Amino acid sequence: MAAACGVSVGSIYNYFDSKAELVGATVESVWCEIFHRPEDEAVFRDTEACIAWMYERMEYGCKQYPGFFTLHSLGFMREDKLDGKRRMQQTWQHILDGLCMVLKHDARIRPDAFTEQFTAEKVADVLFSLMLSALLRQDYDPTAILEIIRRTLY
């Protein structure tokens, strides 16, 4: 990384205490770049549009950063790398919070769609789990998940 930036290795470690911290910050940065806010904010007013956008961004991420969404890159922080794990959890929580916001403000969702057992938070968690599964399988076709949304929420 230092060579690519044209700086010394020592200068990189002025900003990061360890390689694990550097890798964690890099992974966080890539997730943020892939899922940066779209120019069209309407994406966040409609659950179907949001999911379609997320899957488009996942496909973009796969093309832009080949191999990023492999099991290795999703799970590399399991071995005693607390800062990296914390960063990944913060990034994922941000995505989950965004999904919850969309679900709670989507005017198309039936008034009785959510219950005490089937909350917007639980639906967001399921949608996020399906997204992670799709990432690992490199399947960027949201057709099935969009149909699930239509049948359960609209």
Predicted regions and their residues:
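Helix-turn-helix
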Residues: 1-21, 25
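Amphipathic alpha-helical interface segments
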Residues: 11, 15, 57, 61, ...
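Hydrophobic alpha-helical connector segments
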Residues: 25, 39-64, 120-124
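Short, basic, alpha-helical segments at the C-terminal edge of helix-turn-helix-like DNA-binding modules
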Residues: 28-35
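Secondary-structure edge/capping motif, primarily at the C-terminal ends of alpha-helices
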Residues: 38-42, 69-80, 134-138
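Short secondary-structure transition hinges
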Residues: 59-98
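Short alpha-helical scaffolding segments that buttress acidic/His motifs in well-ordered protein cores
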Residues: 71-72, 127-131, 149
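Hydrophobic alpha-helical bundle segments that form small-molecule/ligand-binding pockets
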Residues: 80-81, 92-124, 153-154
